[in-house]
């Protein structure tokens, strides 16, 4: 078996170096300007689904899969097309025909472009000579057009951190998405309601190289990037104005993109738990392979033999077929209100066999720090939830949830696995089409148990506005190259050398430089920090130097500081 060491139950003890840890960050920062491709104001309205004004128009849309201009269909788009979802867009006062995709976009907002170039200069990046806007396929409904407009601005920068330099691969200028207000489940599929106030607000996206050395260095890198962005004094502040995505892998796993890392203090924990998850499923894959005498996975993904993996894939496809069985009659006298009410409304109870997975699906158990240990059953449930169902029942956690031992026995009989204790099963109670889609997703994910984890996008599990425990759930496959194609409604924009020289010659001072200027006054450290945090140090310096207004004398240092701090 594998020589990869590490205790999955003690994620903090995992050694990044011996596990072949790789990590990079993607930072998305809102800019304090108008919208990127319309001249609408970039403001957010403080509304919920319950407080949206009745006079705001609503538009109902459904997205359909289509090939991009490359002639290919993106893998994430293929997956999303299986979900029977429709979307309602609420038109806020700062959204118009462009946000509704009923009018071609305007050219880039000049101020947003200037900020993106300024950030590129601060990161010592190399600007591209021709700015070409691209369309990035987005099929979750958060963009009315089905794509996000993004423009590559610069490449090959560097961010200095106390632990070491981190390369910056790309800096892009792109549109933010709409804000989700509510998702409603119906018998015919999910209806998602979006607010268009945020759609089109400029974002600068900064993607680092995989130079992050440890989970703690990831937090340090995010903090350094956030500080640099705030040094521009031209970015938005507050909750949701900056988002950090983490790209994480270990040698025996593969690249996973984790979204929803709002709180920097959680970043190391989230990364360590992902390392533990990848290690767990690598070991499980080899355990399953050994049981049916299949070649084991090598410890490093770089040594993977594609021919062997295809042979394993074909073997497992035959082992876990997609035969779905109606087991509703096993629950004719069920005490579970959830099951009986769903069936009474026309729902079904379907099941699939899970050969060799009995006892390996797992039950909810905490690790040494209270986070849920990785388990296959949770991954299967996550796959099913992407089809829109509330979840599944699997054999390792039954009897429970109002399902009795007798009903479990009846299900095993209907599935013809009564004499096969190593065979598990999964149940789904939902409308017919949804139960089928959910269980097909369960089988697809179950087959992956024999393989190295797939590349995918995952989301931090959040409860009451904060991470539940640092664990994640699957969102969608990691997008492929077919996701991106040229935007034909926006002209290419050449970047003149003199414009780049102007940007480089007028970079804003860093926080340390501003602090140094304030230290030359008679202010105490506390007031200096307050002036910097409130971004009013320039106003303060203008006042004490007599440059606040023509003819105005220099103001007293401490008195002027107190006045402006108290009034902001």
Predicted regions and their residues:
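Helix-loop elements that line ligand-binding/catalytic pockets
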Residues: 534, 538, 546-563
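Small-residue-rich helix-loop
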Residues: 565-568
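Long, charged low-complexity interaction segments
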Residues: 496-499, 507-547
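Basic, nucleic-acid-interacting segments
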Residues: 2-506, 525, 547-552
């Amino acid at each position: 078996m594998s020589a990869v060491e590490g205790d999955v139950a003690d994620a903090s003890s995992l050694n990044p170096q011996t596990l072949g840890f790789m990590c990079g960050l993607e930072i998305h920062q809102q800019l304090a300007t108008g919208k990127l491709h319309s001249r609408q104001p970039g403001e957010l309205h403080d509304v919920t689904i319950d407080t949206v004004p009745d006079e705001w128009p609503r538009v109902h849309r459904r997205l359909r899969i289509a090939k991009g201009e490359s002639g290919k269909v993106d893998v994430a788009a293929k997956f999303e097309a299986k979900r029977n979802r429709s979307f309602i867009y609420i038109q806020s006062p700062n959204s118009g025909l462009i946000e509704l995709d009923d009018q071609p976009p305007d050219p880039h907002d000049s101020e947003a472009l200037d900020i993106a170039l300024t950030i590129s200069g601060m990161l010592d990046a190399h600007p591209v000579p021709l700015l070409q806007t691209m369309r990035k396929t987005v099929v979750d409904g958060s963009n009315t057009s089905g794509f996000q407009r993004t423009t590559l601005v610069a490449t090959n920068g560097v961010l200095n951190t106390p632990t070491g330099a981190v390369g910056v691969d790309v800096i892009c200028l792109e549109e933010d998405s709409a804000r989700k207000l509510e998702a409603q489940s119906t018998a015919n599929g999910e209806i998602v309601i979006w607010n268009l106030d945020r759609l089109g607000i400029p974002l600068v996206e900064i993607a680092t190289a995989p130079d992050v050395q440890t989970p703690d260095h990831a937090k340090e890198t995010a903090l350094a990037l956030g500080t640099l962005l705030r040094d521009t004094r031209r970015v938005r502040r507050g909750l949701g104005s900056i988002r950090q995505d983490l790209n994480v892998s270990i040698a025996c796993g593969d690249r996973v993109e984790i979204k929803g890392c709002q709180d920097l203090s959680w970043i190391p924990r989230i990364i360590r738990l992902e390392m533990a998850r990848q290690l767990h499923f690598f070991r499980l894959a080899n355990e399953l392979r050994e049981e049916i005498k299949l070649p084991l996975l090598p410890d490093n993904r770089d040594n993977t033999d594609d021919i062997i993996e295809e042979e394993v894939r074909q073997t497992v496809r035959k082992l876990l077929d997609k035969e779905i069985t109606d087991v509703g009659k096993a629950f004719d006298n069920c005490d579970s209100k959830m099951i009986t009410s769903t069936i009474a409304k026309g729902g079904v109870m379907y099941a699939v066999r899970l050969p060799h997975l009995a006892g390996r699906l797992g039950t909810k158990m905490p690790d040494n720090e209270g986070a849920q240990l990785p388990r296959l059953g949770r991954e299967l449930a996550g796959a099913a939830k992407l089809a829109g169902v509330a979840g599944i029942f699997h054999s390792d956690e039954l009897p429970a949830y109002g399902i009795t031992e007798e009903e479990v026995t009846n299900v095993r009989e209907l599935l013809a696995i009564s004499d096969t204790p190593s065979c598990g099963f999964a149940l789904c109670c939902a409308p017919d089409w949804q139960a089928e889609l959910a269980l097909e997703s369960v089988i697809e994910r179950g087959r992956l148990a024999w393989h190295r984890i797939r590349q995918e996008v995952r989301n931090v599990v959040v409860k009451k506005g904060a991470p539940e425990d640092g664990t994640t759930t699957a969102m969608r496959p990691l997008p492929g190259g077919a996701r991106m194609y040229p935007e034909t409604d926006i002209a290419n924009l050449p970047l003149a050398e003199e414009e780049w020289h102007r940007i480089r010659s007028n970079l804003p001072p860093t926080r340390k430089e501003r602090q140094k200027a304030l230290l030359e006054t008679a202010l105490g450290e506390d007031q200096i920090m307050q002036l910097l945090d409130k971004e009013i140090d320039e106003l303060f310096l203008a006042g004490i130097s007599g440059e606040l207004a023509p003819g105005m004398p220099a103001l007293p240092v401490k008195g002027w500081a107190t006045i402006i701090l108290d009034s902001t």
